[in-house]
């Protein structure tokens, strides 16, 4: 390995620029035009979601309810508060997550909680005999991200999940959500929007934020982009892919800490994790009706499958080996594209 491949391999063992090129070229060709169709066809969200204040204490109460749904064992976990949500652990008996509560954005804390509990559940389910060894944790950045995004997006934004849990949310926010129906909530939590900030991006546009960063990183290594032109190229790509005019560096090239902390090659794992999640969903659905399981009282059936096929191995095998054994095939990004297109064409009433 040499050049950019060295850094890519550091964050996701076995990945190279050639492999990522195939992945991101598919995202560019398939999702850029599709996203433009979705943005033009979306219905407006219910005014309650933008007009109401959602008290932090009520949000915390619902996130505590979600701990039970996610099997986030209170004897082994804790949930605190921080400026930016994160997960930390000391083995499979001490997993800690944090959250942040914005009173003008109901969905933010809900999906941060589910996301971080997805990370945490992975660590909780690593086999006991791997604890206190070098293999006693998640196998890779992308595989870890696949677990958090699987629960956040594939499960947590599904109709089946909220058919079960929306009544609880509505009971906690009885005044704020008066007159709001399940379909209104589903449109709200799945709304796509072209935005400047990667960490605030929705499920559909998120991979384009990562695509832009990948293309810039690769360009700096192959000599097609000079460092002094990074901001200009960044702004051009946001205009090309998302139709946005970046107003300043804060909403542009300096928004992430990764490059300034030396973490070059990290960004692609975020999109790869989402793509892994889509293929895991398809594999799981071959073994049992995963959509029915999403609507159960808790995620027990789903978590048991993930433990048996992914979690229990920790990092005792290569990421690709664990993934391919779990899904029964090599990684195929078409599952991700098909998942997004199918979901958003249904939501927006458009043809693919």
Predicted regions mapped to residue ranges:
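Contiguous, non-catalytic segments that form substrate-binding/exosite surfaces or channel walls
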Residues: 1-106, 329
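Secondary-structure capping and boundary motifs in well-ordered enzyme cores
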Residues: 23, 55, 89, 93, ...
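All-alpha helical catalytic cores of prenyl diphosphate-utilizing isoprenoid enzymes
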Residues: 31, 56-59, 63-80, 89-91, ...
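Acidic/polar loop patches that form or flank catalytic/metal-binding clefts of enzymes
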Residues: 75, 129-133, 156-167, 227-228
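Active-site recognition of the HExxH zinc-binding catalytic motif
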Residues: 108-128, 145-149
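Active-site-proximal binding-pocket segments
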Residues: 124-125, 151, 155, 159, ...
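Post-HExxH zinc-binding segment in Zn-dependent metallohydrolases
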Residues: 137-178
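C-terminal, non-catalytic "cap/extension" segments appended to globular domains
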Residues: 210, 214-352
